[in-house]
């Protein structure tokens, strides 16, 4: 997502621009291997069967947005839009809750995760799957909304 966004500010003739687009293309080929059948991605991508790992909203929203925008900008072939669509459908089916007042809630957002500080944030699977989960975190809702715009939803 961030790499796709930053290309908006890198001139077309920049000598490293093609390298950045190649990174996006390589990621686009790799990430579907970790996409769950629901269309979502796990908090720890490569450990889907790890006890306590869960299908997470911010990563799924960020990847949905990244794919949709990269296709729209021409960095990826149109065939990759189906990955964004699958993610959108998964988010709508499994992570969006319609509230009694008509508003929507995006669930299963990791509140925060990162590295650094001893012994906290050690980068272990246990650390990542045990971080607090919250609803409507902006790092999930923002990419979800942006992805919806690129998907024309």
Regions found by a protein language model. Give the residues of each.
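CBM-like carbohydrate-recognition segments
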Residues: 55, 59, 64, 72-153
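Hydrophobic core segments within long, regular secondary-structure runs in both alpha-
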Residues: 4-7, 18-32, 64, 68, ...
């Amino acid at each position: 997502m961030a790499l796709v966004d930053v290309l908006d500010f890198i001139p077309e003739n920049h000598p490293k621009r093609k390298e950045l687009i190649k990174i996006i293309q390589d990621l686009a080929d790799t990430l579907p291997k970790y996409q769950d059948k629901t269309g979502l991605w796990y908090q720890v991508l490569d450990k889907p069967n790890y006890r306590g790992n869960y299908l997470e909203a911010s990563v799924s929203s960020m990847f949905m947005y990244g794919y949709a925008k990269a296709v729209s900008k021409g960095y990826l072939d149109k065939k990759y839009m189906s990955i964004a669509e699958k993610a959108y459908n998964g988010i709508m089916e499994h992570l969006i809750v319609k509230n009694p007042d008509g508003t929507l809630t995006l669930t299963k957002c990791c509140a925060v995760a990162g590295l650094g500080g001893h012994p906290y944030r050690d980068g272990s699977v246990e650390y990542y799957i045990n971080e607090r989960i919250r609803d409507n975190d902006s790092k999930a809702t923002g990419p979800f909304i942006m992805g919806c715009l690129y998907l024309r939803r």
